[in-house]
Amino acid sequence: MVRVTNAYGMPVVAVVGDGQLARMLQTEAIELGVEVRLLAGTDDASAAQVVHDVRLGDYTDLEDLRRVAAGADAVTFDHEHVPNEHVQLLLDAPVDPVPVEPRPQALIYAQDKLEQRRRLRELGAPVPAFAAIESAADADAFWDSVDGEVCLKATRGGYDGKGVWFPASKSELLSLVEELDAPLMGERKIPFDRELSAMVARNRAGEIRAWPVVESIQDGGVCRVAISPAGIPDELARECRELACRIAEELDVTGVLAVELFEAGGEIRVNELAMRPHNTGHWTQD
C-alpha cells in the first residue's frame, strides 16, 4: 500500500541521517519526484541545508525514529548506526507499520563486522581469516595463527578508517585489547594491489542491477578518487559484480549495496559491506 502524505501527491521517503550522502540523495529524489523527510541531529547539518522537511532528533531514540517515519512510504538511512532493534520495532508496529529498506535482518550485516564475516564465510564468499577478540588470550592466539599479520577492528561503529588498528607487535595488540572499551575482532592483514567497489541495487521483488566496478583511491581510510570503470580485466570485473549480486540476494538486501573489495594478483577478498549510497558511487550523479 502506498501512503502519500505529500500535498502534491509525491511519495515520501524518510531518511535517517544528515550527512553528505543524504544531501546527495535529496538531489536525486527531486528528479524522481520523491519527497525526502529528514531526521537530522542539527538544523545546520549538511543534508538539513537542502531538505525542506527536517525533523530534529536523535537516530538512537525510538520516539524520534517513529516521529520521522509516521506516514512515510518508506524509511531508509545514510549510515548504518541506527539501533537494529529500533528498526525492527518500526516494521512491527501494530498500527501503521512502515517499510524499512534495508530490512533489519540484512542491515545487521553492515552494522556488525563480526556477524558480517561469519555470514559471508557461510556463503563461501572470499574473506580474510578472522576471529572474535574477547580477551588477551584470544588476541595472543590470533596473533600466532596469522604470524603477526593482524588488523584489529571494532565490530561496530567504525568507518572511513576509524575503529581499525594495525599493531606492530604482539605486546601492542595486547595493550590495545586491554585499553579499548569496545567489542573487537581480529583479521589477517591482507596485502593488496588495489581497492575495488562493486555496487548493486536490489528492489523488493528481487530484481538487481549492477554499476560498473570502481577502483577506490584511498587516503587515510577515506575514498578520495573513484575510477569508473576500474582498469581491471573483464573477467575479474564480472566476478566482482556476480559476487555483489549473490551477497545482495543471500542477505535479502533492498536498496543499494556496496561491496568493498581488496584485489591482489587477480584474486579478491571482501573488505566491508555498506547498505546505503556509497562514496565510490558519487560519480553516478553525473
Task: Give, region by region, the residue ranges found by the protein language model.
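ATP-binding N-terminal substructure of ATP-dependent carboxylate-amine bond-forming enzymes
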Residues: 1-111, 137
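A conserved helix-loop-beta module that forms one wall/lid of the active-site cleft
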Residues: 95-98, 102-164
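Internal nucleotide-binding/catalytic subdomain
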Residues: 163-259, 263-265
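Glycine-rich phosphate/pyrophosphate-binding beta-alpha loops
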Residues: 273-286
